[in-house]
Regions:
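Conserved CoA-thioester-binding segment of acyl-CoA-metabolizing enzymes
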Residues: 1-61, 97, 278
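Terminal peptide-recognition signature
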Residues: 22, 26, 40-41, 58, ...
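Hydrophobic alpha-helical membrane-association signature
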Residues: 37-40, 88-91, 235
């Protein structure tokens, strides 16, 4: 029997096959990152790091992996927005760093939307599986912000600088199949197969030669932890600085207004509304 040992909005489930599952579990909000969720993610990631089992599975409940920052939590704070965004980013970044530095393999399962910070969080896995219908979108520049959660560090290393610039600057959307072709994810699978495939992959790793897997992962990531940490700090500084500016505040307000009109049934607003952050 699996044993749940943490609380909402992020949970830890320890499976008998030595897979430790870290589950984003706030599906009603698309697993969006506000301060409470970011701090819960940080704390659970650190708890996992203290006892990671044989492999870690990072997944999310509901129809979206993570829609990124909760713009409704950001909006209306005026010049205090930057301080709040910095707190959210710093907590989420501590989680990314803890997961990146885990000695055991990490498998990520992505379903639905992975937007904004959800992209960086997804990419922390050693092996990333995505539903074919998953949708990856950075979305930051559309609302006057810059990437966080390590997205601007992971992307050039995974897809190359040209494609990373395309994703970050134009907010291009990639499906799970696109992401596999680009090298953003390890492989894409049918949506109904994702959970089983991801757990099977993690369980296979947990049952493998533990010392060899840890050593191999150490070689793959040798010397990069400190570099990632410095980059995360700079991402947090930049996104917080921009969040205090008029451009970002106006764009976030416009984004939320478009979403509200779309929900009210305005087809024109729905066509124009971005499909990312909550």
């Amino acid at each position: 029997m699996s044993l749940a040992v943490s609380t909402e909005p992020v949970r830890i489930v320890r499976h008998p096959d030595r897979v430790v599952e870290l589950r984003l579990d706030d599906p009603g909000r698309g697993n969006a990152l506000d301060l409470r969720t970011a701090e819960a993610l940080r704390d659970t990631a650190r708890e996992v790091a203290a006892d990671p089992g044989g492999a870690v599975l990072l997944r999310a409940a509901g129809g979206s992996f993570c829609v990124g920052g909760d713009l409704r939590a950001f909006a209306g704070r005026g010049t205090g927005t930057g301080a709040y965004v910095h707190a959210v980013a710093s907590a989420a970044h501590a989680a990314v760093q803890a997961l990146y530095e885990l000695p055991v393999p990490v498998v990520t399962a992505v379903r639905g939307a992975a937007a904004g910070g959800g992209v960086g969080l997804a990419l922390v896995g050693d092996i990333v599986l995505a539903a074919r219908s998953a949708r990856f979108r950075l979305a930051y520049t559309a609302i006057g912000l810059t990437p966080d959660c390590g997205a601007s560090w992971f992307l050039p290393r995974l897809v190359g600088p040209r494609r990373a610039a395309d994703l970050i600057l134009t907010n291009r959307v990639l499906t799970g199949d696109d992401a596999e072709r680009w090298g953003l994810v390890s492989r894409s699978v049918e949506g109904e197969e994702l959970d089983v495939a991801a757990h099977r992959t993690a369980a296979g790793l947990a049952a493998g030669a533990g010392a060899a897997l840890r050593a191999a992962k150490g070689l793959l990531r040798a010397g990069t932890g400190d570099e990632l940490g410095r980059h995360l700090a700079e991402e947090a500084r930049l996104i917080a600085t921009l969040a205090d500016g008029r451009e970002a505040r106006d764009r976030m307000a416009a984004f939320l207004a478009a979403r509200d009109r779309a929900k009210a049934g305005d087809s024109r607003a729905e066509a124009d509304a971005p499909e990312s952050v909550s």
